[in-house]
Amino acid sequence: MITVKAKKEKVDDVKAFLSNAVNLAREEKETITWYSFQIDESTFGIFDTFEDESGREAHLNGKIAKALMENAPELLAEEPSIKKIDVMSSK
């Protein structure tokens, strides 16, 4: 899971980035689910799931992560918070 804090003047750009990133996620065969969400006015997140650790690592080294890190200085007020989580149960 990742959370990002957009610069106040870049909120719309971060929304657009995340909305468009789903197309890159669809290309990742090992990414099972991918969601972007908004927490408050300028805080956003991505929640995604993978079949196994190799899928997670492929994603973390993939196009979305690369684009986010390249654009982070321009778009984000602080470094992204990336946490590896394991789903314990689901419905």
Describe the role of every protein-language-model region.
Residues 20, 24-33, 49-83:
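An amphipathic, aromatic/His-enriched active-site/gating alpha helix that lines ligand/cofactor pockets
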Residues 9-13:
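Short, conserved charged micro-motifs
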Residues 88-91:
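A short acidic, often aromatic-flanked loop/helix-cap motif at beta-alpha or helix-coil junctions
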